[in-house]
C-alpha cells in the first residue's frame, strides 16, 4: 500500500488491536465513538447525530510522558549473541562475509538474524534493513524473504523493519564494539562494488545504548558538530576530527572506522584545524559549535513533536526513536526540544493556524514540564530551508538539498529505480 500510494519509504506502520485505538488514530474518524461514550456531563450519544468538529485546545502536559521513546530504545541484551547477515541480490539472500559485518550500503537491503536469551529462553530478532537507494525490487524481496525466514523458524522471531537512518539502539550494538557503518549510497555486491568518492566524511555518534554509529555525510564543513567525532578521507591525507563535546566511545569508534577503511589519520582536536583540512571540506563554514556535555544530553535527549490540525483539531504527537531529517513534515509545524532551547520549525506547506497554535504550545510545554524547566527557556522559530547550524546539528546526516526535490517525486523515483 505504501509503495502503491507513493509514500516515502520510511513511512512508519503502526498496528493497533481492536479497542486499543490511540487518540491520534481516532482523530481521523469524524464520527468515532467509544463504547458507552457520552458527551458533556453524561448526555447520551445519539448515533445519527454528528457533532461539528471544533478547535479544542490541546493539553500539552501529556507530552512529558514518553513510553513510546522508552520502548523504541529497548535492549533485549548487550548485542553479543549469534548473528547472520544476508544482502539481497536478484531477489535472493546472499550471505555477507563476517569480516564485513556492520557495514551497510545505501544502495543495498539486508536481513540480519539475531539470536538472544531472555529469562532462560531462546529468542530471535529479524532486522530488515533497507537502504535509501535500494531498488523497489530489493525492498520488496527483503520483506518477502524476511517473512519466509520467520516461517522457517516457526513464526517465533520478532520482525523489525529498519529504514536507513532510523536504526534502533539494539541493532547498532550488534557489532562487537565496532561502529555500525552506513555508507551514503552504493553497493557491496560481488562484482558490482561502488567506487569510493575521492573525499569522504563520516560522522560518528553514540546511540542511547552506548554503542557508536558512523554515517557517511556530505563532505562540507557545515556538517561538523562539536558533540561528535568525524573521519575525513582524501587521496592525499586523512583526518580524525574530535569535537569538544565528543566522547571516548565516539573517538574510539572513529579509530575503528579508520582501520576498516584501511587508512591512517592525523588527529585534529576542534579548534586546531589546518588549512588542508578546511580545504578538503571546501572551506570553513558555520556548524554546531555549542558543545553540550554528554551526561546532560543523556539526561535530556532531544525530543521532536509534530503539530497538525488537519483533522479539525490541533494535536501534537511525539516522533519516536532517534530523530532524523525525514521526520520533518513539510506540511506541518514541528517542535524540537533540546532542553536549553525549544525550536518551532515551520514547514513551507504548514497552515497559518498550525503556526499560531504551535508557538503558543511551545511556551505551554515549557511551563507544564514536571522537571521544573526555566520559564525563560528561549523559543526559536525557524523556517524550512533556513535552519541555523544550532538546529541542524541535532540531526545526523543532514542534507542541505533534501527538499529541493518534491517528497512525492523522490518517493516515485525510488519506486521506479
Swiss-Prot record:
GO biological process, one term: actin filament severing
Places the protein is found: Cytoplasm, Cytoskeleton
Keyword check for Secreted: no
Comment, domains: Comprises six structurally related gelsolin-like (G1-G6) domains, that, in a calcium-free environment, are packed together to form a compact globular structure in which the putative actin-binding sequences are not sufficiently exposed to enable binding to occur. Binding calcium may release the connections that join the N- and C-terminal halves of gelsolin, enabling each half to bind actin relatively independently. G1 and G4 bind two Ca(2+) in a type I and in a type II manner. G2, G3, G5 and G6 bind only one Ca(2+) in a type II manner.
Alphabetized UniProt keyword annotations: Actin capping, Actin-binding, Calcium, Cilium biogenesis/degradation, Cytoplasm, Cytoskeleton, Metal-binding, Repeat
Gelsolin-like repeat start-end pairs: 93-171, 213-261, 316-392
Protein family (similarity comment): Belongs to the villin/gelsolin family.
Role description: Calcium-regulated, actin-modulating protein that binds to the plus (or barbed) ends of actin monomers or filaments, preventing monomer exchange (end-blocking or capping). It can promote the assembly of monomers into filaments (nucleation) as well as sever filaments already formed. Plays a role in ciliogenesis.
Species of the source: Xenopus laevis (African clawed frog)
Entry keyword Calcium: yes
Residues bound to Ca(2+) 5: 107-108, 138, 187
Name assigned to this protein: Gelsolin
Gene Ontology terms, MF aspect: actin filament binding; metal ion binding; phosphatidylinositol-4,5-bisphosphate binding
GO CC term, one of those recorded: cytoplasm
Residues noted as binding Ca(2+) 6 in the record, renumbered to the chain: 150, 155, 157
Binding site for Ca(2+) 8: 331-332, 354
Residues bound to Ca(2+) 7: 227-228, 250
Amino acid at each position: 500500500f505504501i509503495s502503491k500510494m507513493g509514500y516515502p519509504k520510511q513511512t512508519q506502520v503502526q498496528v493497533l488491536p481492536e479497542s486499543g485505538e490511540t487518540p491520534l488514530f481516532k482523530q481521523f474518524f469524524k464520527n468515532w465513538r467509544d463504547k458507552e461514550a457520552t458527551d458533556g456531563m453524561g448526555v447520551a450519544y445519539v448515533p445519527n447525530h454528528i457533532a461539528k468538529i471544533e478547535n479544542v485546545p490541546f493539553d500539552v502536559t501529556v507530552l512529558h510522558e514518553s513510553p513510546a521513546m522508552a520502548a523504541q530504545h529497548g535492549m533485549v541484551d548487550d548485542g553479543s549473541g549469534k548473528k547472520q547477515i544476508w544482502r539481497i541480490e536478484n531477489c535472493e539472500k546472499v550471505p555477507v562475509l563476517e569480516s564485513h559485518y556492520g557495514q551497510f550500503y545505501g544502495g543495498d537491503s539486508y536481513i540480519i538474524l539475531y539470536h538472544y536469551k531472555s529469562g532462560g529462553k531462546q529468542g530471535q530478532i529479524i532486522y530488515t534493513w533497507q537502504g535509501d537507494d535500494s531498488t523497489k525490487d530489493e525492498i520488496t524481496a527483503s520483506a518477502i524473504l524476511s517473512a519466509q525466514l520467520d516461517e522457517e523458524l516457526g513464526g517465533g522471531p520478532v520482525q523489525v523493519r529498519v529504514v536507513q537512518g532510523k536504526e534502533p539502539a539494539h541493532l547498532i550494538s550488534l557489532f562487537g564494539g565496532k561502529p555500525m557503518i552506513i555508507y551514503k549510497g552504493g553497493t557491496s555486491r560481488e562484482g558490482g562494488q561502488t567506487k569510493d568518492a575521492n573525499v569522504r566524511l563520516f560522522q560518528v555518534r553514540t546511540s542511547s545504548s552506548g554503542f557508536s554509529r558512523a554515517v557517511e555525510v556530505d563532505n562540507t564543513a557545515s556538517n561538523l558538530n562539536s558533540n561528535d567525532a568525524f573521519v575525513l578521507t582524501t587521496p592525499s591525507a586523512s583526518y580524525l576530527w574530535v569535537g569538544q563535546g565528543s566522547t571516548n566511545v565516539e573517538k574510539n569508534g572513529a579509530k575503528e572506522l579508520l582501520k576498516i577503511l584501511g587508512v591512517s589519520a592525523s588527529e585534529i582536536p576542534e579548534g586546531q584545524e589546518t588549512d588542508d583540512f578546511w580545504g578538503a571540506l571546501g572551506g570553513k563554514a558555520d556548524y554546531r559549535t555549542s558543545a553540550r556535555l554528554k551526561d546532560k544530553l543523556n539526561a535530556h535527549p532531544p525530543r521532536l513533536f509534530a503539530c497538525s490540525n488537519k483533522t479539525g483539531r490541533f494535536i501534537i504527537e511525539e516522533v519516536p526513536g532517534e530523530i532524523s531529517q525525514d521526520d520533518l513534515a513539510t506540511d506541518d509545524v514541528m517542535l524540537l526540544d533540546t532542553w536549553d532551547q525549544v525550536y518551532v520549525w515551520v514547514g513551507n506547506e504548514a497552515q497559518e493556524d498550525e503556526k499560531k497554535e504551535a508557538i503558543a504550545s511551545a511556551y505551554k510545554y515549557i511551563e507544564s514540564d514536571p522537571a521544573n524547566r526555566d520559564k525563560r527557556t528561549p523559543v526559536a522559530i525557524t523556517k524550512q530551508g533556513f535552519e541555523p547550524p544550532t538546529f541542524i546539528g541535532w540531526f545526523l546526516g543532514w542534507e542541505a538539498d533534501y527538499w529541493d526535490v518534491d517528497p512525492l517525486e523522490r518517493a516515485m523515483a525510488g519506486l521506479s529505480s
